[in-house]
Design a protein with these regions (language model features):
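Conserved beta-strand signature within the Rossmann-like core of class I S-adenosyl-L-methionine
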Residues: 267-274
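Conserved Class I S-adenosyl-L-methionine-dependent methyltransferase catalytic core
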Residues: 24, 36, 74-169
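Short alpha-helix
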Residues: 297-313
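Short, glycine-/aromatic-enriched active-site segment of Class I SAM-dependent methyltransferases
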Residues: 277-295
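Conserved SAM-binding loop of SAM-dependent methyltransferases across substrates and taxa
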Residues: 178-190
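Conserved SAM/SAH-binding beta-strand->alpha-helix loop
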Residues: 200
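A short glycine-rich, Lys/Arg-flanked "PGG" loop and its adjoining helix->strand segment in the class I
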Residues: 254-266
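A short acidic, Gly/Pro-enriched loop at the edge of an enzyme's catalytic core
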Residues: 228-239
């Protein structure tokens, strides 16, 4: 490049713009590459973080060797892979961290961002102009159940505050997802029994498998049901809803809370946790998703949730952030004795 060309780029501001675009695109490519390497099983073919090119071609039954080589070289250029001769090694910190089973929730969250949030952000303007909604049945329920576990440490605190350490206690969980919060409640109180409702059949099956794996099948039951049509003579001490209030239209939430009151014992309580309006970019992207998908609705406003609980007849309504400086909230209320 000639010096005059470089000076012109600097003076025009385009050099700075190009630098910003390159930085942004590199992180976009990094997220896409890592997510694909994990979700498409490429990293599964590495042994102790290493794999030869021939081994990958064989395991992946690839005929387009040039295409696979080009894809792997993107990983090398990003620093996620290292190539020594004809062998590739997993090098990137994020790749290594997300391969750890204990970080599965973060692995799922990355895939959700790359494969789903991206689509909502890019396609929402077109869908809105066409007066169309994203279909609900394309939502990856099992993936969302996994990624939602990123919030576990904060929601665990809310569960612990609502569940006593001992004594007979009956829990109804609406939208139980993976069942992890039922497990938490059962672990906290060995006398607790729970019913988990799950709207999506595949997610309900996953929760049942988890309950059995945790040895809780005699204490927890998972039902595939829409809570709005749920009927039971059983009364509960606590009803919980974690990260799913936006699955119910705003205008239906007050009636939902009234419906849930029917299943509570005198003095029973409700615990609701949710991301709410006013968060960072990740929460803003989620709000696009729930605001443009059929059957869902925008993330809740904390004040509005409190008002709806009170209008439904709950007392002692309290709300508070679970995470400082982020819009993840817990709402707690009770019915009269």
């Amino acid at each position: 490049m000639k010096l005059s060309t470089f000076i012109n780029l600097l003076n025009s501001g385009q050099a700075s713009l190009l630098s910003q675009l390159l930085k942004t695109s590199n992180e976009f490519y990094r997220a896409s590459f890592i997510s694909a390497a994990l979700s498409r099983g490429v990293y599964d073919n590495f042994m102790d973080g290493k794999a030869s090119f021939e081994h990958l071609c064989q395991k992946m039954t690839v005929s387009n060797r040039e295409g696979l080589s080009a894809w792997l070289e993107l990983g090398v250029s990003l620093g996620e892979l290292k190539r020594i001769g004809k062998e590739y090694q997993i090098k990137g910190r994020m790749s290594k961290a997300l391969l750890d089973p204990k970080n599965d929730a973060y692995r799922a969250l990355l895939q959700e961002i790359v494969e789903y949030h991206y689509v909502y952000v890019v396609d929402a303007p077109t869908m809105l102009r066409k007066h169309e909604w994203f279909p609900f049945d394309t939502m990856p329920g099992e993936l969302v159940a996994r990624s939602s576990r990123v919030s576990e440490p904060f929601i665990f605190e809310a569960v612990d505050a609502a569940v006593p350490l001992q004594g007979d206690f009956q829990l109804l969980e609406v939208g139980c997802g993976s069942g992890i919060y039922i497990q938490r409640a059962c672990t906290r109180n060995p006398e607790l029994h729970a019913v988990g409702l799950e709207f999506q059949e595949k997610v309900a099956a996953m929760a049942r498998n988890n309950i059995e794996a945790w040895g809780l099948e005699n204490r927890a039951t998972i039902e595939h049901a829409d809570v709005r049509n749920y009927s039971s003579s059983q009364k509960f001490d606590l009803v919980t809803l974690h990260q799913n209030i936006y699955y119910f239209p705003v205008q239906e939430r007050e009636n939902l809370f009234r419906h849930l009151k029917e299943y509570l014992k005198p003095g029973g309580q409700i615990l609701l946790t949710s991301v709410c309006q006013g968060g960072g970019p990740g929460i803003a992207a989620l709000n696009i998703q729930v605001s443009t998908t059929e059957g869902l609705s925008p993330l809740p406003d904390p004040d509005q949730v409190c008002q709806q609980l009170e209008a439904a007849g709950f007392v002692e309504v309290k709300a508070g952030r679970l995470v400082p400086f982020e819009s993840i909230w817990a709402f707690h209320a009770a019915i009269a004795q």
